[in-house]
Amino acid sequence: MSLRFYNTLTRQKEAFTPIDPADVRVYACGPTVYDHLHIGNGRMLIVFDLLFRLLRHVYGKDHVRYVRNITDVDDKINARAAERGVDIRVLTDEMTAIFHEDAAGLGCLPPTVEPRATEHMAEMIAIIQKLIDKGAAYIAEGHVLFDVPAMPDYGALSKRPLDDMIAGARVEVAPYKRGPMDFVLWKPAAPSEPGWESPWGRGRPGWHIECSAMSWRHLGEVFDIHGGGIDLVFPHHENEIAQTRCAFGHSVMAHVWMHNGHLQVEGEKMSKSLGNFVTIHELLNSDSFGGRKWPGAVLRLAMLRTHYRQPIDFTVKALEEAERTLSEWRHAAEGAEPEAPDANFIDALSDDLNTPRAISELHALKAKRPGALLGGLALLGVDLADLGEEERALPRSAFEQIMALIAEREAARQHKNWAESDRLRDKLAAMGVVLKDNKGGATSWELKP
């Protein structure tokens, strides 16, 4: 079986050959735990959980190390703790616990290691000292900064010309910087802020050095795959590469860099000002999106229907379609025993996590090999048990008829054919089906008692 992944560093799809097949090593940037995670963060969690599952399937579950960090020292954390009047550790512990609930709700496996930044100060200080000793970092007014010209091919990951990056960095450049692109490795901490003793005084780390330190501690100086959202390519991942390569002297930090695409909500960029900022916790536990709660399996399948590198429009309609698909699959597989995933399904995932093609293969298995359908869903991390219980009490033919009528009514509503919509509602009511048109546009249903 040959795995092929798109490498952001080379801008091409490449055959994947791990450094050590008995110890495949993956790092993905985890959350900064100051608030609930939004659904864009959820996409990253699902994508790299699927990668973890696929690698475990290919190399064995005991031969893959997946590290996903927790950033628990950050200016946003300090500000939120002060705003709420709570201790920083109380805030980060609370948000980490909610994050774990959300990740589990999306069907994500725990990573092999989940390091916290605050537990890796010694590693951060050690890397910074290496950079100073090698002339790649300098001390200025209590700060330690990375000297970007020390990295000749800085910008190789983002493919940004250096002049463009310099132009973008010229706004309010700190006077202690030698160059506008230089970035902070260590900075002084105010008495009211968290701080750690270092050779350069009491302070705290910059964001980028945290991931370099944690990946080094748990995966080594060079590892197989580094991942995250596309928004992290620059500056975060670019800076990680620069400081890690300069500290350890290797030509690469990770052999493959994988990034998932952007997410928008109902056709618009997600933002609090637009009122379309959607958190994972809200989707799983409240009726704030589409007027109802959504099972984690529905959220996961809705994400996986779009290839991970493509932008995705997260909509109520997409969730409804994913739920209908899962309901059909559950009825098709009722009474079947799980089997090994189908070879064509595995081939699809092996081709740069081609989930749209993999899902198409599952549709083909629905009638002829329901056990293989279950095996494929298990590998995708989609749990049919997440769905509600309403359709379990129905014969398959009755369930399919109900779903078809609901879909017809939805089409009538979209075309503002209210008479047809009412006719279909009445027909469903005669079958004992009660519809609820929720405030966000989603339609839910239940059987009359």
Swiss-Prot record:
Motif extent ('KMSKS' region): 269-273
GO biological process: cysteinyl-tRNA aminoacylation
Chain residues that bind ATP: 272
Catalysis performed (reactions): tRNA(Cys) + L-cysteine + ATP = L-cysteinyl-tRNA(Cys) + AMP + diphosphate
EC number: 6.1.1.16
Protein's cellular compartments: Cytoplasm
Keywords for this protein: Aminoacyl-tRNA synthetase, ATP-binding, Cytoplasm, Ligase, Metal-binding, Nucleotide-binding, Protein biosynthesis, Zinc
Cofactor remark from the record: Binds 1 zinc ion per subunit.
Subunit organization: Monomer.
Protein name: Cysteine--tRNA ligase
Species of origin: Methylocella silvestris (strain DSM 15510 / CIP 108128 / LMG 27833 / NCIMB 13906 / BL2)
Classification lineage: Bacteria, Pseudomonadati, Pseudomonadota, Alphaproteobacteria, Hyphomicrobiales
